[in-house]
């Protein structure tokens, strides 16, 4: 067990924008990595707001990782090209977004029931070895076993870490986190694993850390 557990600042769409991240870093600090809300393609182009949000000159935090969401490697590659243009050497791939309008098009957690599509999408990590990739995901869309079926694919990839939110996509943010499902994935995951979900106070961090001492870190959203 690490003496100090790394804390990752979760990307919350519509909330954790650049000014919020900058203010948090200036007033509180203590965060190992900040993540941008996902960048996506809209009508085959970028939203101006997304481009502004990831611009290095807009961000004054110690360590910022841009996140992308896409249903295909072609779209993911287009987004990654923007990150590279801006000088980033890391990228987080969103396989966790639960919002139905995106998920039904196999974005975010909507792609989790389709292992072949996940494998093709994450081929991005092999095509760009100069980029350090991570993945943020859920247990599945319909079934917590979906992540277990994806484990062999994920284990074969050069990922920096995986962040797991132990709910199903169809739950969105309702119901309880499935800690048994998280434990099952932890036991088959060969990458450093970060826990995300329902961490609202230091006691929650302590409880999760005691239950899962092998954790590589925690990602906190609303609790920050």
Predicted features by range, described:
Residues 1-224:
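Flavin-dependent oxidoreductase catalytic cores
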């Amino acid at each position: 067990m690490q003496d100090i557990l790394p804390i990752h600042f979760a990307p919350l769409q519509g909330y954790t924008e650049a000014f919020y991240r900058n203010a948090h870093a200036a007033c509180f600090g203590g965060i190992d990595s900040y993540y941008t809300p996902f960048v996506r393609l809209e009508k085959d182009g970028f939203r101006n707001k997304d481009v502004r949000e990831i611009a290095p000159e807009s961000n004054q935090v110690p360590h910022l990782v841009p996140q992308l969401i896409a249903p295909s490697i072609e779209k993911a590659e287009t987004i990654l090209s923007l990150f590279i243009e801006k000088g980033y050497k890391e990228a987080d791939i969103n396989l966790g977004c639960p919002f139905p309008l995106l998920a039904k098009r196999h974005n975010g957690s909507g792609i989790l029931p389709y292992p072949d599509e996940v494998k093709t999408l994450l081929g991005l990590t092999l095509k760009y070895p100069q980029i350090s990739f991570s993945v943020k995901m859920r247990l599945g869309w319909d079934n917590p076993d979906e992540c277990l079926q994806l484990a062999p694919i994920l284990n074969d990839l050069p990922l920096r870490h995986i962040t797991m939110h132990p709910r199903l996509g169809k739950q969105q943010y309702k119901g309880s986190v499935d800690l048994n499902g998280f434990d099952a994935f932890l036991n088959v995951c060969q990458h450093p694993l970060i826990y995300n979900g329902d961490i609202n106070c230091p006691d929650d961090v302590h409880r999760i850390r005691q239950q899962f001492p092998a954790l590589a870190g925690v990602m906190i959203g609303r609790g920050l």
